[in-house]
């Protein structure tokens, strides 16, 4: 099992499970969309300010992120420490620009960027930046047979 193979698995899809820690120490799991920026060893995720996962990360920035192949035979877990961007407050602030980059990397072009910018502010969106410190899992192809 190599880290490169696990990074490849993180890069292949755009959906996974973000694991944060509740106040009582139990895990809280959220299905989310992501993009893995391999050169930065960074998983980025768009979230809203009022969600449990966001509150959990403000209190304890440790997190894990799980992805798997469609057949679930291969998986990767990325563990690390999260940094949260500021909440989007203006359609042209740095947070909205980062959200646009993330959207493009996950989905592609948006049909109306002005509408998107306004929605990011209205929804009080921000970016979760999970700096990958450790990976483990079973790379694609290693569990066939």
Task: Annotate each PLM feature.
Residues 74-145:
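Charged, gly/pro-rich active-site loop segments
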Residues 14-49, 63-67, 75-78:
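Short beta-strand segments
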Residues 12-13, 60, 123-124:
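Structured helix-beta-strand junction loops
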Residues 1-17:
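Short, basic/aromatic recognition patches
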Residues 71:
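AMP-binding (ANL) adenylation modules
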């Amino acid at each position: 099992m190599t880290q490169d193979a696990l990074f490849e698995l993180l890069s292949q899809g755009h959906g996974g499970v973000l694991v944060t820690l509740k106040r009582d120490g139990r895990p809280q799991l959220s299905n989310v969309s992501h993009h893995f920026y391999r050169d930065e060893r960074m998983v980025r995720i768009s979230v809203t300010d009022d969600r449990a996962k966001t509150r959990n990360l403000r209190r304890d920035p440790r997190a894990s992120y799980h992805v798997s192949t469609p057949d679930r035979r291969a998986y990767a877990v990325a563990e690390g420490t999260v940094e949260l961007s500021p909440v989007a407050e203006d359609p042209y602030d740095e947070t909205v620009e980062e959200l646009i980059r993330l959207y493009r990397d996950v989905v592609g072009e948006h049909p109306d960027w002005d509408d998107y910018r306004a929605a990011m502010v209205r929804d009080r969106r921000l970016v979760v930046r999970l700096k990958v410190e450790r990976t483990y899992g079973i790379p694609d192809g290693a569990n066939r047979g």
